[in-house]
């Protein structure tokens, strides 16, 4: 960080100033002094010249108003920035609130206690409240509209300072005796503050300043110290909060008059005076510190006595009240920034996030990439890469085998130019100073430095990635103590214990090139090492403490900027004789410049460099300066006689919207002179000048000028001198052209004036060349336009190419509908298929598939598209069209179209369908999805397997004994599947014997085949038994409830044949009930005998049946009244009559109806009452 005095404003009549305050938002400067002096000034930057921005732009006083109202010396001035108010107070205790009206300041409110003098006033963070403290201990808190909120008298206490906390909940009162008391916002005392900085201090002390940064622009680090308290004896403490037990302690070694944080709380300015040992007087100085107590530098200020200081709102200037003058100093902050491959990388803090926001701004394409990085320490760049040095996250997993003794507390993150992290390296060394070359990163703490040979992904092989630990042993990572004398051997040990060994002479700066590493130490010693094999070559001794070091492109000279901003140069290899007559290596060059805050060597010339001195940029060639350029930019790059600089001050005013206007390009004098010579004198003289001052950029400039004049000889010579092979080829191409106008057109195109070149081609009637030019540029819209507008027929292949290229243009931007139109014209079926798919236009995709010839290479892709969206039929069609039946079957299986899969497998004689079905069915059964498995088998025409599973479900449901109708339906479904199985077997056999004797023969053979297979299951022979059992069971009960007791008994008697399906107890209980109702007590008696003999019943249940039987048969004789009618049912046997499935009665007539599906009978007179079979519910025809 550098600072220098830039402006001085005198107060009329030599009136001594007492206080100064700079409004952070609007830029007004209020200063108060003796005899009631109160002035409001405003410095405004002139922006007439767009090149001059920021600090480099001239500034004038746009306001200089004297405010009349105070009679005594004005001692306190404070701004309310939110409400544009100024509050001032004088030695008589008079307080005036001023307001801005039509560009001038006017009194708004006046208050005078007439008892005591105001010592301090402070507005809270949102500008709603002001706290005023008087010397006699009175405290008043008022609102912005002038109303008093509360007041308090602190008896026996002299107050001198007050400040609010960021959340307005705490007030700190500074006492005249040096104590600080903490109060809440209602004026209740909480506690005294512990002042660690005053330990062992004796004598009277007073508070010089209290400033609590409110975090309005974010914090440089989470939990960052922000409350600064400083005493007149120079002791200072910076606290994280009012109860911080471990504050940062500073002894400034000066008499302090005031302190203030900058706008983001990153720099604390401490103003006062210091005794000079050599002179018997005090000098005014401002010292700058970080929130962690690190000293950033000292600014010396002329004059007798400084009384106050105030920062500008952007932190780029500071105003100092000294005697009767206001001095302004410019600040050049140490921004965290870098420049790599057209990308400016910069970091800033935001109030809404604890991390740093790191922006990678591609200045070429105006694209921005943002990363959030916790505890960022620095940004270092080189080539196409950058290193972000940060503190390690405490809970972040470290690399395997990374740290054995020490926990890695810092990370070096290698990123590319868009912020993608490529390789993080965890180290246990504070990276205070980081340098980077094309192959290495060097990080240094105060005691040691670490080197890491980084590699980027394109160079890494899989083998190398797996050898991280070994590569470390081979020397990719090394660590050296600054006091060591390394020999350059690679057998050193990677040992972090070196990093914690102390040194009396700490490191203060480092720099490196591909072959040299320079380490600067606080004593002024410069150590030079060979690189990358680190060996100490030389030690040099200088009389300054380096702050910034830089090597030129051939590592022969070192530029040093010290902490006072003095730039010197050291020649590393020159041998000179010192004062003792000894020959030494290295010489300090005579050039010395003051107030320098940035410098950059040219990448391609060891004698060229650019430096920033105050608000001027100087370019030096062989230590001779060119005329300065007014700018305040930070130098990004110096190459090809051009300097690129970036106005970081302007960018960071609005970091989210960087503008290309803030990138400045400057040409050095030799480039400007060469251009002027070429334009005004001619190519020959310019050629001679460039010969005397050779540089590839100048030769290129000459070559381009010669090309424009078609001086091909000079152009070729110049291209040879700047080693531009493409340029040489282009000149040869021009030499082969006959027409001058053709040459001219080619040159115009070479310089990028494509519209003019095209016009010339068309004027020459060479539409083909115009089209060729546009094709090279990739301007296919114009190509298409030229093809269509020509008089002759357009080339079909070119038209297709243009249409396809435009299709690609739209497809890249995901404008699929537009792309389709051009792909259709370009007959690009592959891309057309993709567009249809992205548009979900499956009809178009199907039409495309149908239009393709068989075995076209695109068909499998289209089929896969259909598969992905579940369109089985279209996918199968496409697969079959390209002769991939296996893929078609797999698709059917994948989409659960098993019947289609079986059909395909059969038609293409594929054997694996059975195993596929079995595998999928077992998967469904494992998940207890039996019905899904049945459906699967049924769809695949595996009726027998489906029937087995359905029969199993019916059996399980029957065991529940709840819903007999549901059980009947399940048995019916099972039987129907068996019937379909029988039919399938017959049809299969018919197919086998086709062409044999007769249809009867084939039917018989089918039955025989079926008979063999049907022995595999007990239910295949009589599939309808279960359905019959539950049909009669339900029918009997329905008939009984409807009062047809005789019919119910006949039906119930059938149930005796189904004891294997329905429990005997239910059958005989129903039979006994029906027989009793029908007064067939003989049948009833037999049913009771059967019930009493059942072994499944408990003794208690048997007893209940016996009691019931006793009750019935004591009243009725166990004989059937109508025995003759029941004979046929009771006897059974071979001559058993068929049963009517509708009534349960035996069929004795010759005419009856037979169901075609289940083969059961119904009485002829009964069937007229039914539309469907009573058992299987098939249609009655």
Curated annotation (Swiss-Prot):
SMART domains xref list: WD40
Primary location class: cytoplasm
Subcellular location: Cytoplasm, Cytoskeleton, Microtubule organizing center, Centrosome; Cytoplasm, Cytoskeleton, Cilium axoneme; Cytoplasm, Cytoskeleton, Cilium basal body
Domain of life: Eukaryota
Keyword Repeat: yes
GO cellular component: axoneme; centrosome; ciliary basal body; cilium; intraciliary transport particle A
Ranges for the WD repeats: 12-51, 69-108, 113-152, 154-193, 502-539
Disulphide connectivity of cysteines: none
UniProt cross-references to Pfam families, sorted A to Z: Beta-prop_WDR35_2nd (PF23390), Beta-prop_WDR35_TULP_N (PF24797), TPR_IFT80_172 (PF23387), TPR_WDR35 (PF25170), Zf_2nd_IFT121 (PF23145)
Keywords: Cell projection, Cilium, Cilium biogenesis/degradation, Cytoplasm, Cytoskeleton, Repeat, WD repeat
A biological-process GO annotation: cilium assembly
Biological function: As a component of the IFT complex A (IFT-A), a complex required for retrograde ciliary transport and entry into cilia of G protein-coupled receptors (GPCRs), it is involved in ciliogenesis and ciliary protein trafficking. May promote CASP3 activation and TNF-stimulated apoptosis.
Quaternary assembly: Component of the IFT complex A (IFT-A) complex. IFT-A complex is divided into a core subcomplex composed of IFT122:IFT140:WDR19 which is associated with TULP3 and a peripheral subcomplex composed of IFT43:WDR35:TTC21B. Interacts directy with IFT122, ITF43 and TTC21B. Interacts with IFT43. Interacts with CFAP61.
Name of the molecule in the record: WD repeat-containing protein 35
Organism: Mus musculus (Mouse)
Gene assigned in the entry: Wdr35
């Amino acid at each position: 960080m550098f600072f220098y005095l830039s402006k001085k404003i005198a107060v009329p009549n030599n009136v001594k100033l007492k206080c100064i305050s700079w409004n952070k938002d609007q830029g007004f400067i209020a200063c108060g002094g003796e005899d009631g002096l109160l002035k409001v000034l405003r410095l405004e930057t002139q922006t007439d010249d767009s090149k001059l921005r920021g600090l480099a732009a001239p500034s004038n006083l746009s306001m200089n108003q004297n405010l009349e109202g105070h009679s005594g010396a004005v001692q306190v001035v404070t701004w309310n920035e939110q409400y544009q108010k100024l509050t001032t107070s004088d030695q008589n205790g008079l307080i005036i609130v001023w307001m801005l009206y039509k560009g001038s300041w006017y009194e708004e409110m006046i208050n005078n206690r007439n008892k005591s003098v105001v010592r301090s006033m402070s507005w809270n963070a949102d500008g709603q409240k002001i706290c005023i403290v008087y010397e006699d201990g009175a405290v008043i808190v008022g609102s912005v509209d002038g109303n008093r909120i509360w007041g308090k008298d602190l008896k026996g206490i002299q107050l001198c300072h007050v400040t609010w906390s960021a959340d307005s909940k705490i007030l700190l009162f500074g006492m005249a005796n040096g104590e600080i008391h903490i109060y809440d916002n209602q004026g209740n005392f909480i506690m005294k503050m512990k002042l660690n900085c005053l330990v062992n201090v004796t004598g009277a002390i007073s508070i010089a300043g209290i400033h609590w940064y409110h975090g309005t622009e974010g914090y440089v680090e989470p939990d960052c110290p922000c409350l600064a308290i400083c005493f007149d004896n120079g002791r200072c403490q910076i606290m994280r909060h009012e109860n911080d037990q471990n504050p940062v302690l500073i002894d400034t070694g000066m008499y302090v008059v005031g302190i203030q944080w900058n706008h983001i709380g990153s720099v604390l300015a401490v103003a006062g005076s210091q005794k000079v040992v050599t002179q018997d007087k005090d000098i005014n100085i401002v010292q700058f510190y970080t929130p962690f107590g690190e000293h950033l530098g000292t600014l010396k200020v002329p004059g007798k006595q400084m009384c106050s200081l105030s920062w500008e709102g952007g932190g780029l200037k500071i105003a100092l009240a000294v005697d009767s003058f206001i001095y302004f100093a410019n600040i050049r902050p140490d921004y965290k920034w870098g420049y790599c491959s057209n990308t400016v990388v910069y970091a800033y803090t935001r109030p809404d996030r604890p991390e740093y926001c790191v922006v990678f701004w591609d200045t070429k394409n105006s694209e921005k990439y943002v990363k959030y990085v916790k505890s960022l320490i620095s940004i270092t760049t080189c080539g196409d890469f950058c290193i972000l040095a940060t503190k390690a996250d405490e809970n972040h997993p470290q690399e395997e085998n990374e740290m054995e003794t020490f926990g890695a507390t810092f990370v070096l993150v290698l990123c590319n130019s868009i912020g993608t992290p490529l390789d993080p390296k965890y180290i246990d060394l504070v990276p205070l100073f980081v340098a980077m070359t094309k192959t290495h990163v060097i990080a240094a703490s105060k005691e040691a430095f670490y080197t890491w040979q980084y590699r980027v992904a394109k160079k890494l092989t899989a083998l190398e990635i797996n050898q991280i630990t070994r590569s470390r042993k081979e020397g990719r990572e090394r660590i050296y103590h600054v006091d060591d004398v390394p020999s350059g051997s690679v057998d050193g040990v990677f040992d972090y214990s070196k990093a914690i060994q102390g040194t009396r002479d700490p490191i203060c700066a480092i720099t490196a090139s591909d072959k040299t590493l320079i380490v600067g130490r606080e004593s002024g010693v410069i150590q030079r090492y060979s690189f990358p094999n680190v060996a100490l070559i030389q030690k040099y001794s200088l009389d300054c403490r380096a702050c910034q070091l830089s090597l030129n492109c051939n590592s022969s000279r070192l530029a040093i900027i010290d902490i006072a901003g003095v730039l010197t140069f050291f020649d590393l290899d020159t041998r000179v004789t010192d004062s003792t007559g000894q020959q030494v290596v290295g010489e300090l060059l005579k050039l010395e410049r003051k107030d320098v805050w940035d410098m950059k060597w040219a990448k391609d010339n060891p004698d060229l460099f650019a430096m920033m001195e105050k608000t001027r940029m100087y370019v030096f060639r062989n230590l001779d300066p060119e005329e300065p350029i007014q700018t305040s930019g930070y130098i990004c790059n110096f190459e090809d006689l051009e300097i690129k600089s970036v106005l970081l001050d302007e960018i960071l005013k609005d970091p989210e919207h960087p503008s290309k206007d803030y990138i400045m390009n400057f040409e050095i004098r030799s480039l400007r002179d060469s251009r002027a010579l070429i334009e005004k004198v001619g190519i020959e003289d310019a050629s001679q000048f460039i010969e005397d001052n050779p540089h590839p950029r100048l030769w290129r400039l000459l070559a381009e000028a010669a090309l424009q004049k078609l001086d091909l000889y000079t152009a070729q010579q110049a291209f040879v001198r700047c080693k531009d092979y493409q340029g040489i080829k282009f000149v040869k191409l021009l030499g082969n052209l006959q027409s001058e106008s053709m040459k001219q057109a080619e040159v115009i195109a070479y310089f990028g004036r494509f519209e003019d070149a095209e016009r010339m081609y068309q004027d020459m009637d060479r539409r083909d060349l115009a089209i060729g030019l546009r094709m090279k540029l990739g301007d296919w819209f114009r190509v298409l336009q030229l093809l269509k507008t020509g008089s002759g027929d357009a080339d079909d292949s070119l038209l297709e190419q243009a249409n396809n290229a435009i299709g690609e243009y739209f497809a890249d931007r995901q404008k699929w509908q537009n792309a389709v139109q051009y792909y259709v014209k370009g007959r690009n079926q592959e891309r057309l298929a993709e567009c249809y798919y992205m548009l979900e236009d499956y009809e178009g995709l199907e039409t495309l598939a149908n239009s393709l010839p068989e075995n076209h290479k695109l068909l499998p892709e289209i089929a896969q598209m259909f598969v992905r969206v579940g369109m089985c039929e279209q996918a199968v069609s496409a697969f079959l069209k390209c002769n991939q039946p296996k893929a078609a079957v797999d698709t059917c299986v994948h989409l659960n179209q098993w019947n289609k899969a079986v059909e395909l497998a059969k038609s293409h004689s594929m054997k694996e369908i059975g195993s596929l079905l079995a595998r999928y069915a077992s998967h469904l059964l494992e998940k207890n999805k039996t019905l899904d498995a049945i459906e699967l088998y049924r769809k695949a025409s595996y009726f027998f397997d489906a029937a087995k599973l359905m029969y199993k479900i019916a059996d399980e449901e029957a065991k529940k004994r709840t819903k007999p109708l549901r059980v009947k339906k399940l048995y019916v479904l099972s039987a129907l599947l068996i019937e379909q199985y029988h039919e399938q077997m017959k049809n299969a056999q018919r197919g086998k014997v086709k062409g044999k004797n007769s249809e009867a023969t084939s039917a018989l053979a089918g039955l025989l085949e079926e008979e063999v297979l049907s022995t595999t299951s007990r239910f295949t022979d009589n599939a309808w038994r279960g359905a019959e059992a539950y049909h009669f069971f339900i029918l009997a009960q329905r008939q009984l409830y409807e009062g047809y007791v005789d019919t119910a008994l006949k039906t119930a008697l059938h149930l005796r044949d189904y004891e294997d399906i329905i429990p005997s107890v239910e059958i005989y209980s129903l039979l006994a009930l029906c027989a009793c109702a029908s007064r067939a007590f003989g049948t009833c008696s037999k049913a009771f005998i059967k019930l009493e003999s059942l072994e499944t019943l408990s003794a208690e249940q048997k007893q209940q049946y016996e009691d019931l039987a006793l009750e019935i048969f004591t009243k009725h004789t166990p004989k059937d009244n109508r025995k003759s009618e029941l004979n046929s049912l009771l006897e059974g046997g071979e001559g058993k009559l068929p049963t009517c499935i509708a009534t349960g009665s035996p069929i004795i007539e010759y005419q009856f109806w037979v169901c075609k599906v289940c083969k059961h009978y119904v009485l002829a007179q009964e069937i007229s009452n039914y539309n469907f079979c009573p058992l299987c519910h098939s249609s009655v025809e």
